[in-house]
Amino acid sequence: MKLRAYCVNLPSDEARRDHCIREYQKAGIAYEFIEAVDGREQDVQPDPALSIEQQKLWDNIDKTALSIGFFNRGTNSAERACAKSHALVWKRISEVSDAEKGVYFLVNEDDFNVLELGGLDKALNEAEDLNFDMIYLGYRGGNYHKSTPKERMQRIWHRMKWLLSDKSDIAKFRKNLILLGKARVHRQSQFFYHAGMTWGGHAYLLNRAGARKLLSYNENLRFLPDEAFRYAILDGQFSVGMSKVKYFGCDTQFGSALRSQEDHDAHHEMFPSD
């Protein structure tokens, strides 16, 4: 599979753009820049709901997200700008023709860097035969660890508890946090795990079906991009892989162009560069 990349970038940030061009040329990846939204210069707000039903859906998503501790309590303008910038790419991918419906496109933020190219071509070729909506090629946290006996017992308990539960979205998400929250072995894959609650939007593959699902979950810019990934996973309708090798990293030299600097610094303090 020959990669084509979309990179979100503020046109005013030529240093980042030049950095990305060098990284793409190093990896031999065809690329296109998508003009990012700057939430520091304007107050980015979501469009209003088009119907009562849509507003009810958004309210339920918010209520369910707040029941899981690691989701933010909404987003500020800079974070909504980040979400909207990724959504511009998702929309582009969601509109590809049927001939390209199974194609994975690489999505990058403009602080990505290339860590490893060895084995990438083989991994990409295998990805075409796997049923993932999205695949992390770079991520923070959520690395694979073999399950402990306690964790296996927890999964059995939560499956049983689900059979007796009221089947609410909150109950479903709490169950799936145990069942799907950690990286898991993919029995048919040499190069990928099933992803759990990992982090990062700097380098991921996305196909048409995955893009359409993400757009439906984050119409009101409720989530940062990687929060939308995790919410979709916990809803049980979004299949995500993660490469065993981290092919792409996140270069901290630039700070943050799309989110608040305070938020960006706190994130990288929690998840230092690999």
Regions found by a protein language model. Give the residues of each.
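An acidic/histidine-cluster motif and surrounding catalytic segment
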Residues: 1-108, 112-274
